[in-house]
Amino acid sequence: MKITYVGLIKVCFLVFLLLCATVLLNISWRQRDSSQSLQHCNSTCSAKYLETKLKEAHLTGRHKKWETYRLDAKPTSATGQGHQHFAKEPLQIKDLFIAVKTTKKYHGNRLNLLMQTWISRAKEQTFIFTDWEDQELRQKAGDQMVNTNCSAVHTRQALCCKMAVEYDKFVLSDKKWFCHLDDDNYLNLHALLDLLSTFSHSTDVYVGRPSLDHPVETVDRMKGDGSGSLKFWFATGGAGFCISRGLALKMSPWASMGNFISTAEKVRLPDDCTIGYIIEGMLDVKMQHSNLFHSHLEHLQRLPTESLLKQVTLSYGGPDNKWNVVRVNGAFSLAEDPTR
């Protein structure tokens, strides 16, 4: 019995030695294969090898399929403030929904200017939202004039009422971009298309110019119990702003079918501030700040003349500051062309 037990131990020891030898041999062969692969990689990944293959590709024409995919392409500044974006999609005027907010007393002096200038180049894309059924304007604009039936008084409620109608009409359209303007804005359509073409309408885009140099802080009446505060940026409506369709649809719970008015009442903010509240405060989407939009609150004479063609919107001073206009050299004097 003892002899059998000792013999079994010897057999097990021999089997163990054989297994160890097999493992060592496998490790040795794998290291050899790895060394050969590394040598092959070093030879085919060298700069000299790649340059040779690149020349061969140019000679055979095989590179043409990929020549538009430039890894070293430099993005261009889109918003005019250092923000950089790659071009996403071709854009045409027909893809825009341009909403112009106005009121009865400005149908004559302000709207006539717009109808004679930039609106004439985008008649089918521009909708005029007003508070009075003006038959003369109806004849000029047709169905592009929208009587909101909102109050003509310049109050938060009246402004939000018009913005609510603007939003709902855009959502019902098939347009890719919603752009809001005031009736004292001049719109450079080419510059607007250049700007929006750098984004995708299916992504979350909210672009405009803030009127303040800091975010607004207000009581958070929507998310919490009203004891906390919320900070957010908003694009001033006086300079104009644009929202992508993808983002506009996400705003629906707080903006569609009259909800915009109730949201504005809860947070007690005007129309453009409420837009920023919904986008930044509720949806947590950051506004794209752009200095290509301009309102009458700016010192417009400081804009360099050579940069005017690059600006998306321009404006002019009101009765209290009628000389606040851009500097433009031309055949007409300031008295003849007061809004420039």
Curated annotation (Swiss-Prot):
Glycosyltransferase that initiates the elongation of O-linked fucose residues attached to EGF-like repeats in the extracellular domain of Notch molecules. It is a single-pass type II membrane protein. The keyword Glycosyltransferase applies. The keyword Acyltransferase does not apply. GO terms for biological process: regulation of Notch signaling pathway. It is found in: Golgi apparatus membrane. Disulfide bonds join C150-C161, C179-C242. Its EC number is 2.4.1.222. Its cofactor is Mn(2+). The active site is at D272. The chain crosses the membrane at residues 5-25. One of its GO terms (cellular component) is Golgi membrane. Has some activity with cobalt but not with magnesium, calcium and zinc. Residues 1-4 are cytoplasmic. The lineage of its organism: Eukaryota, Metazoa, Chordata, Craniata, Vertebrata. This is Beta-1,3-N-acetylglucosaminyltransferase radical fringe. PANTHER family: FRINGE-RELATED. Its main location: Golgi. InterPro entries: Fringe-like_glycosylTrfase. Mn(2+) binds at D184, H296. Belongs to the glycosyltransferase 31 family.
